[in-house]
Curated annotation (Swiss-Prot):
GO terms for molecular function: DNA binding. Residues 253-273 are annotated as: Disordered. Belongs to the begomovirus movement protein BC1 family. Pfam families: Gemini_BL1. Disulfide bonds: none annotated. Transports viral genome to neighboring plant cells directly through plasmosdesmata, without any budding. The movement protein allows efficient cell to cell propagation, by bypassing the host cell wall barrier. Begomovirus genome is shuttled out of nucleus by Nuclear shuttle protein (NSP) and the movement protein transports the DNA-NSP complex to cell plasmodesmata and facilitates further movement across the cell wall. This is Movement protein BC1. Keywords: DNA-binding, Host cell membrane, Host endoplasmic reticulum, Host membrane, Host microsome, Membrane, Phosphoprotein, Transport, Viral movement protein. GO terms for biological process: transport of virus in host, cell to cell. One of its GO terms (cellular component) is host cell endoplasmic reticulum membrane. It is a peripheral membrane protein. It comes from the Viruses.
Length: 298
């Protein structure tokens, strides 16, 4: 059952079509959001919000022979500065287009609206400060009781000028990072080198502890190795096996090689007289060796 309900019916919240001046620095595009009254209603209902769809209508106001590229960026200010970009569009300055971006995240109504639209122009023969286009942004929001997984839908560009084609435009959207499991670290107050707290190994019938253990692996999966090993599949599997399971072949060794010898309870205990005899013999050997080396020096 879909828990989303439209905030403003099924209509888009539209900003006024506004003229923008050409600049080489990123400048904001006006994006209209719900009124304070509407946001208060959603807050009272205890719901969160989601940006369903953003449409940016670009209409140029430049001469026939104008050159340059317009770059429109959509950002989410909740992330760190270097990772805020969510999508980016590029198109010729003389091309009329509609840019479509479909959201992939929710946000709290108690926070400031995290979305920003920015534009800039590069490699243009149009002077800075000249009004070069009209831009209108339309926004569609929805409210939900709680967040759910959102199916990714790629952004699109609708070209309205006949003199331009798909090879004149480009767009990009951010990818989802690969999930990495982070192992639990040592308890507070313990040394890092003492090793992690491993869970007991479950040995099933027909298995050995050596084949199931992973002694020798890194104590943390926080970082991935920057080096790539260029070997074939068979060698790669063997390498990974030896690295992750260094004791896999321990059970195949003969029992004699694994026998540490008699235990303390099985060996004959030494008396004080035996220990004194060993010390006396050792001292005598050291004295004899020292005297021999002294004669050689003379």
């Amino acid at each position: 059952m879909d828990t989303s309900v439209p905030v403003i019916s099924s209509d888009y919240i539209q900003s006024a079509r506004t003229e923008y001046k050409l600049t080489n620095d990123e400048s904001p595009i006006t994006l209209q959001f719900p009124s304070t009254l509407e946001r208060t209603r959603v807050r009272i209902m205890g719901k969160c919000m989601k940006v369903d769809h953003v449409v940016i209508e670009y209409r140029n106001q430049v001469p026939f022979n104008a050159q340059g590229s317009v770059i429109v960026t959509i950002r989410d200010t909740r992330l760190s500065d270097e990772q805020q970009d969510q999508a980016q569009f590029t198109f010729p300055i003389g091309c009329n287009v509609d840019l479509h971006y479909f959201s992939a995240s929710y946000f709290s109504i108690d926070d400031n609206v995290p979305w920003q639209l920015l534009y800039k122009v590069e490699d243009s023969n149009v002077k800075n400060g000249v009004t070069f286009a009209q831009i209108k942004a339309k926004l569609k929001l929805s409210a939900a009781k709680h967040s759910t997984d959102i199916r990714f839908k790629q952004p699109t560009i609708k070209i309205l000028s006949k003199d331009y084609g798909p090879d004149c435009v480009d767009f990009w959207s951010v990818g989802k990072p690969k999930p990495i499991r982070r192992l639990i670290q040592n308890e507070p107050g313990t040394d890092y080198d003492t090793g992690p707290k491993y869970r007991p190994i479950t040995v099933q019938p027909g298995e050995t502890w050596a084949t199931k253990s992973t002694i020798g692996r890194s104590t943390s999966m926080r970082y991935t190795s920057p080096k790539q090993i260029d070997i074939d599949d068979s060698s790669s599997k063997q390498y990974a096996s030896e690295a992750e399971f260094p004791l896999r072949g321990l059970h195949q060794l003969p029992e004699a090689s694994l026998d540490p010898g008699d235990s303390v309870s099985q060996t004959q205990s030494m008396t004080k007289k035996d220990i004194e005899s060993i010390i006396e013999q050792t001292v005598n050997k050291c004295l004899i060796a020292h005297r021999g080396s002294s004669h050689k020096d003379l």
